[in-house]
C-alpha cells in the first residue's frame, strides 16, 4: 500500500490529528468540550448495513485493504471511512490482521496521523495497538484527546514500554471512565509515583474486585505498617477499603481481602 502523504484532493478537510492539536492548545489540561465535536469532516451517517451482515462485510472489506499493496493512501482512507464500524469494533478489526506486517503498521500509523474521517482513524488505531513504538507516543496522546479515540489511544499507549507517564497524562485529560483503561495495566508497575496514582483512583470508578486487586498488588497492609505514613496514603487506603465494601459488582470483596485485618 502506498502511504504517501500527498493529498489526492485539495479540498479535503484538515486531519483529525490537526483538529485535536488545535483544540488541545485551547484546553490543555481538561477533557475537550463535547469530546472534540464538531469534527472538520462529519463523515456522514453510519453506513446502513444490517446487523447480521455487518461482521462479514467488515471482514471482507478489511481483507481487501490488507491484500491491496498498490492501493493509494487516500483511496485506502476513503475505503476505511465507509466501513460499518464504531470504536467498539477494534477486536473485530484485529481479528482480520492479528499479526500485521510492518507495511500494514505503517498504513495504520498514516491513517491515525492523516485521517479526516473518524472511522478511518479507528481502523488505524485498532491495527496500531500492540505494535506502536516510542515514536508513536506524541501521535497517540494528541489523537486520544478526541473522545471517540481515547480508549483506543490509551490501549495502544499502555503497550509501549516506558510510556507510563504518557498514559497517565492522557487519562487525566479524557472522560472520567477512561481512567480505568489506564489503571488496570498500571497496577503492577513498580514506580512509586505511578503506584500512588493507581491507588488514587476515584472511588466511584472502583468496583470492589478492582479495589481488592490494587490493595493486594500494592501490599496495602505493609505500606500502612511502615513509618512514616503520610496523609495521602491514609486517604488512598480509606478509599480502597470503602470501595471493597461496595456491592456494585454484586458482591463485596472486603471479607476476602487479605489485608483487611491488618489494616
Labelled PLM ranges:
Residues 169-253:
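Long alpha-helical HEAT/HEAT-like repeat alpha-solenoid scaffolds in very large eukaryotic proteins
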Residues 1-135, 146, 218, 224-262:
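Extended repeat-based scaffolds of very large eukaryotic assembly and lipid-transport proteins
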Residues 85-89, 114-123, 133, 144-152, ...:
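Generic helix N-cap/helix-start motif at coil->alpha-helix transitions
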Residues 107-110, 137-141, 166-170, 197-198:
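Buried hydrophobic core positions in alpha-solenoid tandem helical repeats
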Residues 122-125, 141, 154, 168, ...:
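Hydrophobic core positions within HEAT/HEAT-like alpha-solenoid repeats
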